């Protein structure tokens, strides 16, 4: 890994401690990235421990293949396939811990050719796995005003969503303009159409770029499926540690843990026998502690950790 694309794992010790690693346990790192969390988990495992790591980014897979360790298995695919992978390796009900480090990694942001950053000019792509799906540039050509507005508002929580969407549509309808294929073009376009007051707080393209990335990679659907999959494959007392980086992700994780810790909700006064109530099932998880945020020292060392939140839950 080059120094330029170095990745600093966020909340590393806290997330690993949250898994309560057993030396002979079986663990899944749903987001290998550049291997910071995976390597730390391996360092805590004994010779009978096992780690399965997942990533859909081919560059992450290439990095993972450098690990020569019989206890380690890398799986190329989305973490939404976690339950399927667990069945493939006969792990259902035997996994002692799952770690999910959500969002985009520093190497993905720093590599202009991946098209994630509005700070560096590159192809307007944003796919976690460039071998599947379509790039943002193609989607913007095919989308209409309402589509673009909805994505920016829903996944970027940007109050200027329609204004930005109108700017994008107007740009593309002007035949004198070059096709919108570069991150630099899109960042400038958004900056040009954003209100002046909006520009003073942070780069006006921040939320729109986040929105397009989340949408093009189906990130929220992936997270929802991965959380359900993780809960279904954990052994009793198995742990799940989830690091999120923006409010949409954290709300999903928080609500999932809350829902799974409450069990089925039976309307008050509904005439059910004790056997019928038992048949509905019970709580599946319990939250461990409160949400954890990075220390001031970590934020000073890695400003990208500033918005991160760690939540931990245990299988009942």
UniProtKB/Swiss-Prot annotation:
Amino acids binding S-adenosyl-L-methionine: 35-37, 55, 79, 101, 108
Positions with biased composition (Basic and acidic residues): 294-304
Coiled coil stretches, renumbered: none
GO biological processes: rRNA base methylation
Keywords: Cytoplasm, Methyltransferase, rRNA processing, S-adenosyl-L-methionine, Transferase
Subcellular location per the Swiss-Prot or TrEMBL entry: Cytoplasm
Region (Disordered): 291-316
Enzyme Commission identifier(s): 2.1.1.199
InterPro entries noted in UniProt: RsmH, SAM-dep_MeTrfase_MraW_recog, SAM-dependent_MTases_sf
Key word Protein transport present: no
Catalytic activity: cytidine(1402) in 16S rRNA + S-adenosyl-L-methionine = N(4)-methylcytidine(1402) in 16S rRNA + S-adenosyl-L-homocysteine + H(+)
Molecular function per GO: rRNA (cytosine-N4-)-methyltransferase activity
GO cellular component: cytoplasm
HAMAP family: 16SrRNA_methyltr_H
Family: Belongs to the methyltransferase superfamily. RsmH family.
Protein name: Ribosomal RNA small subunit methyltransferase H
Organism for this UniProt entry: Vibrio atlanticus (strain LGP32) (Vibrio splendidus (strain Mel32))
């Amino acid at each position: 890994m080059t120094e330029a694309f170095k990745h600093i794992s966020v909340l590393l010790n806290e997330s690993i401690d949250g898994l309560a690693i057993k030396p002979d346990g079986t663990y899944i790192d749903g987001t290998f990235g550049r291997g910071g969390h995976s390597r730390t988990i391996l360092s805590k495992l004994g010779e009978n421990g096992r780690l399965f790591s997942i990533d859909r980014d081919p560059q992450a897979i290439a990095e993972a293949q450098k690990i020569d360790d019989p206890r380690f298995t890398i799986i190329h695919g989305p973490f939404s396939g976690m339950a399927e992978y667990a069945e493939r390796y006969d792990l259902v009900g035997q996994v002692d811990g799952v770690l999910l480090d959500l969002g985009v990694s520093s190497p993905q942001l720093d590599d202009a050719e991946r098209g994630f950053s509005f700070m560096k000019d590159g192809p307007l792509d944003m796919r976690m796995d460039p071998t599947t799906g379509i790039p943002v540039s193609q989607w913007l050509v095919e989308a209409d005003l309402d589509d673009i507005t909805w994505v920016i508002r829903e996944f970027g929580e940007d109050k200027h969503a329609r204004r930005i969407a109108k700017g994008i549509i107007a740009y593309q309808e002007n035949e004198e303009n070059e096709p919108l294929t570069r991150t630099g073009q899109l960042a400038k376009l958004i900056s040009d159409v954003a209100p002046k007051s909006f520009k003073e707080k942070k780069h006006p393209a921040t939320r729109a770029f986040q929105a397009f990335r989340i949408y093009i990679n189906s990130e929220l659907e992936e997270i929802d499926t991965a959380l359900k999959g993780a809960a279904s494959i954990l052994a009793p007392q198995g742990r799940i540690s989830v690091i999120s980086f923006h409010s949409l992700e954290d709300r999903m994780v928080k609500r999932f843990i809350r829902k799974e810790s409450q069990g089925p909700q039976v309307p008050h006064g509904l005439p059910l026998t004790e056997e019928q109530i038992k048949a509905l099932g019970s709580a599946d998880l319990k939250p461990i502690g409160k949400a954890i945020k990075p220390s001031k020292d970590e934020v000073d060392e890695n400003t990208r950790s500033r918005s991160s939140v760690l939540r931990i839950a245990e299988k009942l």
